[in-house]
Amino acid sequence: MTATILVADDDAAIRTVLNQALSRAG
């Protein structure tokens, strides 16, 4: 449930982190 709250509250920040992870992976 905490993860859901974080996604809803800091969606932009999480997207940035995911983008960085995808960049490193790809």
Curated annotation (Swiss-Prot):
Localization of this protein: Cytoplasm
GO cellular component term of the entry, any: cytoplasm
UniProt GO MF annotations: ATP binding; DNA binding
All copies of domain Response regulatory, residue ranges: 4-26
Keyword match DNA-binding: yes
Key word Phosphoprotein present: yes
PROSITE patterns assigned to the protein according to its UniProt record, in alphabetical order: RESPONSE_REGULATORY
Superkingdom field: Bacteria
GO BP term, example: phosphorelay signal transduction system
Principal subcellular localization: cytoplasm
Keywords: Activator, ATP-binding, Cytoplasm, DNA-binding, Nitrogen fixation, Nucleotide-binding, Phosphoprotein, Repressor, Transcription, Transcription regulation, Two-component regulatory system
PTM remark: Phosphorylated and dephosphorylated by NtrB.
Protein purpose: Member of the two-component regulatory system NtrB/NtrC, which controls expression of the nitrogen-regulated (ntr) genes in response to nitrogen limitation. Phosphorylated NtrC binds directly to DNA and stimulates the formation of open promoter-sigma54-RNA polymerase complexes.
Full protein name: DNA-binding transcriptional regulator NtrC
UniProt organism field: Rhizobium leguminosarum bv. phaseoli
Primary gene name: ntrC
